Amino acid sequence: HLIRPMMYGANHFIENISNPNDIERYYSVVGYICEIDTFANNRKISSISPGDILSFSNAGAYCFSMSSNYNSRYRPAEVLYIENELKIIRKREVFEDLIKNQVEINL
């Protein structure tokens, strides 16, 4: 859903906000869609464990407006991380969001 890195190489600062002070290691950060879903290659990030939350900084408003429901994937929630607090600013999509504008027709 963050298409900018794949489309034109936009570089977003990625931080492990679950474990920000651990030793830094090199990671490739990828998504769950098979085609060109790579956010960063060989990026230095604090040690990552399953369940950690990664923050993509300086993403801006275009990230949502450029997102899609490719492969019927729900758009994730948007979360603002400010003053050590997580605030949901857009809810995660659900199945009903994918079909709400579809119209049933009888052929």
Predicted regions and their residues:
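Charged (often Lys/Glu-rich) extended helix/loop segments that serve as interaction or gating elements
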Residues: H1-L107
